[in-house]
Regions:
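A glycine- and Lys/Arg-enriched "phosphate-lid" helix/loop adjacent to the NTP-binding pocket
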Residues: 2-27, 37-89, 136-143
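NTP-dependent small-molecule kinase module
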Residues: 87-146
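Arginine/glycine-rich "motif VI" loop of SF2 helicases in the C-terminal RecA-like domain
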Residues: 36-40, 97-100
Length: 146
């Protein structure tokens, strides 16, 4: 999830909703909705790709120094880096408030893209295999499943 500050500022949130508990209430709503989905049989997998500050800086520099990657870079990226600690606290709070049995978070080290892809793929494969096993019907007249 990436929140663009400039987009967030344009949101038309009714003033009556913007109170001291706006984020706590929203996180609770998210957790309740995801629990509802889980009880309905929907598999909810959430991944937080945890890139270190140093790795993020390397990637930003590569985007600046590689013309075909310039489109990925925004000046707001430089400005937002000063709030790294605030973002980490917000992520920690959001993950803690919305991690449930029905909708777990996978906090994945993401400095090495190959490792990140491996971990995410493995979690998805495991969920799909669970679904296949859950909905597999027994073959007629045979003890084993198809």
């Amino acid at each position: 999830m990436r929140v663009h500050e400039e987009i967030l500022k344009q949101q038309k949130i009714p003033k009556s909703l913007v109170g001291k508990r706006i984020w706590e209430d929203r996180l609770a709503d998210i957790a309740h909705f995801e629990d509802y989905l889980g009880r309905q049989g929907v598999i909810v997998l959430k991944f937080f790709l945890n890139v270190s500050r140093e790795q993020q800086k390397k990637r930003f520099m590569k985007r600046l120094n590689t013309p075909e990657k310039n489109w990925k870079f925004s000046a707001s990226d430089v400005h937002e880096r000063q709030f790294w600690g605030d973002y980490m606290l917000a992520y920690e709070e959001a993950i803690g408030a919305t991690a449930t049995k029905h909708a777990p978070w996978f906090v994945v080290p993401a400095n090495n893209k190959w490792f990140t892809r491996l971990v995410v793929s493995a979690a998805i494969v495991e969920a799909v295999e669970w679904l296949i096993d859950r909905f597999r019907l027994p073959c007629a007249g045979v003890v084993r499943t198809c």
